């Protein structure tokens, strides 16, 4: 099956945000990216949508959830500063059934570096701009065997 790793879309400026960073929303551009992800991932096969509980991650996947009639499940293992082991365990848990997981720019490179150094076939150079997707393809046992990159949708 397949696990889709999505980095949250463009958020408002961190320096200009005085409130709790967990509450920082997407920017206007980020909202457009989130809606464009619906078409980009229209043929993707997954039955769960998991997200960091941070507002910007939840907002990134809400349009996909609405289009598919699926709930968005907030998961701390995808939050900023989450331990790599927790995220790896989450990917492994959902590798057979398929899932979309929205996360942050600190966790995504750690996951990708782990898979690259573990011998997973990386079909593209490692990068993780906001709104991008990495598609993790698994074998019948749920082991990640290939990863490919989908650039962020252009608005």
Predicted regions and their residues:
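Active-site-proximal alpha-helix that buttresses catalytic centers in soluble enzyme cores
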Residues: 2-82, 120-121, 130-131
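Generic beta-sheet signal
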Residues: 3-4, 95-106
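Short active-site segment of divalent metal-dependent hydrolases/proteases
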Residues: 11, 107-108
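Glycine-rich phosphate-binding loop signature in dinucleotide/nucleotide-binding domains
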Residues: 43-45, 93-97
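Hydrophobic packing residues within well-ordered alpha-helices of enzyme cores
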Residues: 60-64, 87, 111-112
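Short alpha-helix plus adjacent loop in nuclease-associated cores
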Residues: 79-91
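Domain-level recognition of soluble alpha/beta enzyme cores
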Residues: 118-146
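Short, solvent-exposed aromatic-acidic interface loops
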Residues: 147-155
């Amino acid at each position: 099956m397949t696990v889709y790793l999505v980095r949250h879309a463009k958020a408002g400026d961190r320096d200009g945000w005085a409130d709790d960073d967990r509450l920082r929303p997407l920017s206007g551009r980020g909202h457009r990216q989130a809606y464009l992800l619906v078409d980009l991932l229209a043929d993707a096969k997954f039955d769960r949508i998991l997200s960091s509980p941070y507002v910007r991650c939840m907002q990134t996947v809400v349009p996909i959830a609405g289009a598919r009639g699926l709930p968005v499940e907030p998961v701390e293992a995808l939050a900023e500063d989450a331990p790599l082991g927790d995220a790896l365990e989450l990917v492994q848990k959902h590798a057979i059934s398929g899932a979309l997981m929205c996360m942050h720019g600190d966790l995504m490179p750690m996951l990708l570096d782990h898979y690259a150094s573990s011998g997973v076939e990386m079909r593209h150079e490692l990068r993780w701009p906001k709104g991008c997707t990495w598609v993790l393809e698994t074998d019948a046992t749920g082991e990640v065997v290939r990863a490919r990159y989908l650039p962020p949708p252009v608005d």
